[in-house]
Structure formats: C-alpha cells, structure tokens
Amino acid sequence: MQSTRKTNQLAIPDLSGKVTIGDLLEAFSSYEKEIISIKLSKQRRSRDEDLKVGYVEFETVEDTEKAYGEGSVKVAGEAKALHYAKRKDQRMKERVIVSSKKVYISGIPEDTDKDELSALLGNCRISGGDKGKNYLFAEYDNSEEQERALSKINNMKIKGSKLFAMPAYEKANIGRIGRRKGDFN
C-alpha cells in the first residue's frame, strides 16, 4: 500500500480512452459531496495513445484518504489502482529550495563590467549577467556572507539604477530514489 501523503487529490492512471468524467464520478459516488473537481487528461509517456489519467480532487486530505481506501477503485467495470497526486503547482514548489549561499540580483545596467560587479559584490562567484540581461547570480561561501551581501546590495544604486537582491532558488536534491514510472506525485 502506498504511503499517506498530504494531498487532497487522487490519480487513476491507465484508463481507457472511452472513460468519461461521469464514469469517475460514479466510481466515487459515495464521496460525491466531498469532491471538488474531476479532470481527465491524455496520459503522458503511454505507448497506447488512447489511455487517459483521471484526477479526483477532494475537499480535505482526510476525505482523500477515505476515498483511497484499499488503493483501488472500479471505473467503468474495471478495477484500477489509485495513486496520491499533487497539483502541478504543488509539485513545482517541492523541486526548488531557497539557497543559503546564492543571491539573485536584478536592476544591473547593461554597460556594467565584471570588475565593477566584483568590487560591489565582494568575494563571490558570479554567474549570468550576460550582455542584454539586467540580472545575475552571486554565490558566496556561506549563509553569513550571503546575508551580509543581501543587506549591503538591496536598494543600492549602480550607475543610477537601483539594485534588488534576494536569496536565489536552486533545485532541490530530490533524486530519483523511490520514484516509479507510475508514481504521479
């Protein structure tokens, strides 16, 4: 059985192309009042072009867990496995983290050269800042240096242009451990 996740959505993959939203509503008829939305999409990464995946969103995580039950449901007469799913915006949030060393800096005039930036930013590695872009990333050795840089740089002016600095985002090291082809989280 799949582990419980804090989500209010279930995914039902490998549905026939003939399955309708009505079929999904019927499959979850005992939870009709708790259902917020039902969506059917063409299944990606499928060899069979007619397969669909259904998403059923419930009001609460508790409702979702009740509907999950034993992990399967009968849709249009066929037993189908259930998976906990998250909306795309929830999945994206989990893939990035706020960096403890990198700083995103915008508002940099195009004609600013690397020497000026190095003098302004101090001891760091600079990436980005290519011609035509008014932003760059500066990576410091530790979080204390990052904090000092944020305090110093934010609202500073260079060549009359006000700079804006904030901690950068970086990819979370989530790896592929525990991910299966059919796992929709």
Curated annotation (Swiss-Prot):
The keyword Nucleotide-binding does not apply. It comes from the Eukaryota. One of its GO terms (molecular function) is RNA binding. Keywords: Repeat, RNA-binding. Residues 8-87, 101-170 form the RRM domain. SUPFAM superfamilies: RNA-binding domain, RBD. It comes from Encephalitozoon cuniculi (strain GB-M1). This is RRM domain-containing protein ECU09_1470.
